[in-house]
Curated annotation (Swiss-Prot):
One of its GO terms (biological process) is 'de novo' CTP biosynthetic process. Homohexamer. Its EC number is 2.7.4.22. This is Uridylate kinase. One of its GO terms (cellular component) is cytosol. The keyword Cytoplasm applies. Residues 23-28 are annotated as: Involved in allosteric activation by GTP. Belongs to the UMP kinase family. It comes from the Bacteria. One of its GO terms (molecular function) is ATP binding. ATP binds at K15, L16, S17, G18, G58, R62, T165, Y171, D174. The gene is pyrH. Its main location: cytoplasm. InterPro entries: AceGlu_kinase-like_sf, Asp/Glu/Uridylate_kinase, Uridylate_kinase, Uridylate_kinase_bac.
Amino acid sequence: MSTNPKPAFRRILLKLSGEALMGEEGFGIDPKVLDRMAQEVKELVELGIQVGVVIGGGNLFRGEGLAKAGMNRVVGDHMGMLATVMNGLAMRDALHRAYVNARLMSAIPLKGVCDDYTWTEAISLLKSGRVVIFAAGTGNPFCTTDSAACLRGIEIEAEVVLKGTKVDGVYSADPMKNPEAVKYDTLSFAEVLESELKVMDLAAFTMARDHNMPILVFNMNKPGALRRVIMGEKEGTIISSKQPA
């Protein structure tokens, strides 16, 4: 039961890593994880939240190894964009099976597969209650899906970018390696930069900072965490331009 009867946000951009879709597998998409995520998104829609989604592609394609072997970076990034489209198709299908209206929009034209991205159409769809999945990153090489999430969040005038990860917030050090690592509840953009805390790549992070777009990092693998974040309960780490109390 939530102690706060009203959601803390009205329109959000949810960023999911491709790796989150793998579950316990080492590659690809775990159907159980996909369906659970679709159900959690459905809960938000039923609360009246307008939901945009950006999914990474690391579960299907990682370009680093091929780049070291000599592959052109632009080619590798284009392959990565297509991986995000595949994940987007899977998420759209899972949402449809959960009886949630969803639209997949791609930053690169893929006629017959998904719609071309336009920000005016995306906002119109969100206002009508549809979940909008943004695929193919920004459509440009050398840009991460974190950058795409911040860019789309700013464009659709989301109130927050929710970054779903494998850990339940931002820590002073890697909690997997350092048991003494301390979790932060709130941080300012300046503190993250000063302490060199790993939240997302610098280009994405500074874009969010420059447009006063709050970032909330939480554990997407923790059942109910997404709903708690939306209801304004203590969950994850919020990063904003405001100084912590």
